[in-house]
């Protein structure tokens, strides 16, 4: 029996009025059992069958919507105690109009697209994002109701803050006034179509009473003594983890008789505690500078052979350019390690000032120990190979490109995913995130305007990108102004109003346009996308002050903006030519005169969570795999690259399955036909770093840049060393996020093939070389690699 026939026979008779009946029934219906059986039948096919994947997702949505309130009246009755007062009152006041909006959405293409995103998308939405009641038979918020809740929250903030109301009115293009429902409908259109994708905290908590909407926090406490250390871990960090967010923690100042490993175990234990029976995982990343006397103990904390290793902790190191310069000159020379109690200025300084202080301390004999530079480098690389981390930051790049002078209070750490660059000081830095789904910006050339050979040819629409960025600025600022603050330090840090707007689906855009990831056309489009995004975000933020009468962010008077300078102008030789120079000049002059609402704008974060929901490639990365598997809270699910399989010709499917979707191993003519679907492991990582450098001037925070390496490349430490040195020479802020290694294993050899006629996976080429199967990003990366739902 075909999938279509199965659905018609077993599901066709389910009446529409059954929707919502399970809210009170509390038992599995015949429809649910039938649908679940079909899902189980489809799940073995979803890795390569786009229709099976879409059908499994639609069925899961149907099962779960039977557990959702059927009307907004029911919704308020169930979730009234959870919603904030303003949001609840707004829904009650506009209940009919909102109901009409939701009904229209369920008839729209946007809703169809959401249903067709596949099984993993449907599972992720209900497992992670929507509200639910407690108990053994929970009632769930529907996906449409979730988007409505967030949109209503944004509208409430617009009504409360004049500058946001002005921006909403400007976006809707109403010169005089705009109704509150018009704001909801406008924002809802972008969120529900997943053109603008909000970070997990926003989707889960916007509109909820006391909702904490920031994604990550950064702490830079003094840990010079035991009371200071305990205060940092329990007074500062614990409330942040309790708020279901990620934390970046600088431990470079750790200096007393205890070992850093004991301190890290305390952090690890807290993360483990807060993740116990927690729907949304939290995480913490500890950062240390490379000159610290306990750096080797720090790097050993996650090694698999360490019986006391910190399973739940992530790590990062901040390296001064001095280390790389000395290594390039003579790797056999000594690298000196210091106790921060005797070398406190090394934490505060960067650049020439750091170099001078380091040399002074060496001459004065203030060091604790020393080791050859090559030994320090090997220790770092050994840890990377075994654990996939620590993240690697370049201290000078973090500070030289910051929006204000940081000499004397240098930045030396980041957030949980190493894409946020802020100066915590005595406050707590805050990450407020969203991302633009770039494939939603693709448009088709109208056949009436061009010849038939160009009909249906896609192009990237920068106007659509600009509109989405403006909506993201509105949504994030609504969350900044309307979110709760777990600690006083967060409230102070939020005054900088730092945003992090990222992207997802860049690889899908290139593939749809027929570009290989490293083609010249891709490189140009990549850079232009980020220049356009940065300009639009800065201009919109400025207009919140200029036209909306908003107050500039705290500290703008001493920022580069007050001098009319932009982030890209701190990069030597950079010319922003996609946006005409006279527009940059006029904008800079106006900002210097009137101010700007936000301090930071773009960040390239890993979009693991929201990319699973949309089905597009994560962040700016090339495709991980064309067939992969994903472990959810309950099961392991095959995940297809939908963009790839939509392009696969029916006659080629047998070959695709035989080679596990690995284009690099296809026969020559198939390899050429599908060359734009090579994976990240097939591209030169040095060239991927070059691409990161090309977009870096327009990413004023940083980029979570991972290395994607085949296993044979990490057998020699020199390859990783050369990658780190290349990133240093390029001047990147984040040299490495994770080191993902493609191991020599095959998913195809293990998977159960639904079609008995499908060819078995041979596992080996004729010449005896290993034949890769479909790649599982979770298995390819180290065990430390998280599915970072904390940020996205």
Curated annotation (Swiss-Prot):
Spans annotated as Disordered: 758-781
A single BP term in Gene Ontology: deoxyribonucleotide biosynthetic process
Enzyme Commission number(s): 1.17.4.1
UniProt-listed Pfam families: Ribonuc_red_lgC, Ribonuc_red_lgN
Keywords per UniProt: ATP-binding, Disulfide bond, DNA replication, Early protein, Host-virus interaction, Nucleotide-binding, Oxidoreductase
Site note Important for electron transfer, residues: 737-738
Subunit text: Heterotetramer composed of a homodimer of the large subunit (R1) and a homodimer of the small subunit (R2). Larger multisubunit protein complex are also active, composed of (R1)n(R2)n.
PANTHER family attached to this UniProt entry: RIBONUCLEOSIDE-DIPHOSPHATE REDUCTASE LARGE CHAIN (PTHR11573), RIBONUCLEOSIDE-DIPHOSPHATE REDUCTASE LARGE SUBUNIT (PTHR11573:SF6)
Known role: Ribonucleoside-diphosphate reductase holoenzyme provides the precursors necessary for viral DNA synthesis. Allows virus growth in non-dividing cells, as well as reactivation from latency in infected hosts. Catalyzes the biosynthesis of deoxyribonucleotides from the corresponding ribonucleotides.
Protein name listed in UniProt: Ribonucleoside-diphosphate reductase large subunit
Organism in which the protein naturally occurs: Human herpesvirus 8 type P (isolate GK18) (HHV-8)
């Amino acid at each position: 029996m075909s999938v279509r026939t199965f659905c018609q026979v077993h599901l066709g008779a389910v009446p529409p009025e059954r929707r919502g009946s399970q809210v009170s029934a509390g038992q599995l219906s015949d429809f649910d059992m039938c649908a679940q059986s079909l899902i189980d039948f489809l799940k073995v096919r979803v890795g390569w069958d786009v229709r099976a994947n879409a059908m499994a997702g639609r069925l899961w949505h149907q099962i779960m919507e039977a557990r959702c309130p059927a009307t907004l009246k029911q919704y308020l009755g169930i979730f009234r105690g959870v919603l904030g007062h303003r949001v609840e009152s707004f829904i009650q006041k506009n209940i009919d109009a909102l109901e009409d909006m939701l009904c229209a959405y369920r008839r729209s293409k946007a809703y169809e697209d959401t249903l067709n995103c596949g099984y993993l998308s449907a599972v992720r939405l209900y497992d992670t994002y929507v509200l639910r009641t407690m108990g053994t038979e929970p009632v769930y918020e529907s996906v449409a109701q979730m988007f409505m809740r967030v949109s209503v929250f944004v509208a409430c903030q617009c009504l409360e803050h004049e500058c946001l109301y002005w921006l909403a009115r400007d976006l809707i293009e109403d010169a005089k006034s705009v109704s509150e429902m018009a704001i909801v409908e406008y924002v809802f259109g972008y969120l529900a179509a997943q053109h603008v994708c909000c970070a997990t905290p926003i989707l889960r908590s916007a509109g909820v009473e006391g909702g904490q909407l920031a994604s990550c926090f950064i702490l830079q406490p003094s840990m010079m003594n035991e009371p200071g250390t305990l205060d940092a871990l329990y007074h500062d960090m614990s409330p942040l983890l309790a708020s279901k967010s990620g934390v970046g923690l600088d431990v470079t100042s750790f200096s007393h008789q205890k070992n850093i490993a004991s301190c890290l175990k305390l952090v690890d234990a807290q993360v483990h505690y807060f993740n116990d029976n927690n729907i949304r995982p939290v995480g913490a990343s500890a950062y240390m500078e490379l000159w610290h006397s306990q750096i080797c103990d720090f790097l050993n904390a996650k090694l698999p052979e360490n019986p006391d290793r910190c399973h739940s902790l992530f790590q990062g190191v901040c390296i001064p350019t001095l280390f790389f310069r000395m290594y390039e000159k003579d790797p056999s020379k000594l690298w000196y390690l210091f106790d921060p109690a005797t070398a406190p200025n090394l934490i505060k300084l960067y650049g020439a000032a750091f170099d001078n202080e380091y040399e002074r301390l060496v001459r004065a004999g203030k060091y604790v120990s020393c080791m050859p530079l090559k030994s320090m480098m090997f220790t770092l690389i050994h840890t990377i190979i075994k654990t996939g981390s620590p993240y690697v930051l370049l201290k000078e790049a973090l500070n030289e490109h910051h929006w204000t002078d940081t000499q004397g209070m240098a930045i030396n750490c980041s957030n949980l995913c190493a894409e946020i660059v802020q100066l915590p000081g005595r406050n707590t830095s805050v990450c407020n995130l969203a991302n633009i789904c770039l494939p939603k910006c693709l448009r088709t050339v109208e056949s009436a305007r061009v010849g038939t050979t160009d009909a249906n040819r896609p192009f990237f629409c920068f106007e659509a990108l600009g509109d989405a960025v403006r909506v993201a600025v509105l949504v994030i600022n609504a969350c900044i102004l309307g979110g709760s603050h777990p600690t006083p330090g967060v409230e102070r840090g939020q005054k900088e109003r730092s945003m992090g707007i990222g992207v997802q689906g860049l690889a899908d855009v290139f593939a749809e346009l027929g570009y290989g990831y490293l083609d010249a056309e891709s490189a140009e489009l990549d850079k232009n996308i980020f220049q356009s995004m940065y300009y639009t975000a800065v201009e919109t933020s400025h207009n919140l002050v200029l036209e909306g009468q908003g107050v500039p962010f705290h500290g703008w008077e001493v920022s580069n903006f007050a001098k009319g300078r932009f982030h890209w102008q701190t990069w030597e030789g950079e010319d922003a030519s996609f946006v005409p120079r006279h527009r940059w000049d006029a904008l800079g002059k106006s900002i210097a005169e009137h101010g700007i609402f936000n301090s930071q704008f773009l960040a390239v974060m890993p979009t693991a969570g929201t990319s699973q929901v949309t089905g597009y490639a994560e962040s700016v990365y090339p495709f991980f795999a064309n067939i992969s598997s994903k472990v959810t809270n309950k099961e392991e699910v095959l995940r297809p690259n939908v963009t790839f399989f939509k392009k696969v010709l029916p006659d080629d499917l047998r070959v695709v399955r035989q080679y596990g979707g690995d284009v690099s191993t296809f026969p020559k003519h198939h390899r050429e036909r599908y060359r734009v679907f090579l994976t990240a492991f097939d591209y030169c990582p040095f060239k991927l770093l070059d691409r990161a450098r090309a977009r870096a001037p327009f990413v004023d925070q940083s980029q979570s840049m991972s290395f994607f390496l085949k296993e044979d490349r990490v057998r020699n430490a020199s390859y990783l060393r050369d990658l780190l040195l290349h990133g240093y020479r390029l001047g990147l802020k984040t040299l490495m996020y994770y080191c993902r290694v493609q191991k020599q294993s095959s998913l195809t050899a293990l998977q159960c093939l639904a079609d008995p006629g499908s060819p078995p996976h041979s596992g080996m080429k004729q010449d005896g070389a290993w034949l890769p199967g479909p790649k599982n990003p979770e298995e390819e990366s180290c065990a430390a690699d998280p599915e970072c739902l904390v940020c996205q």
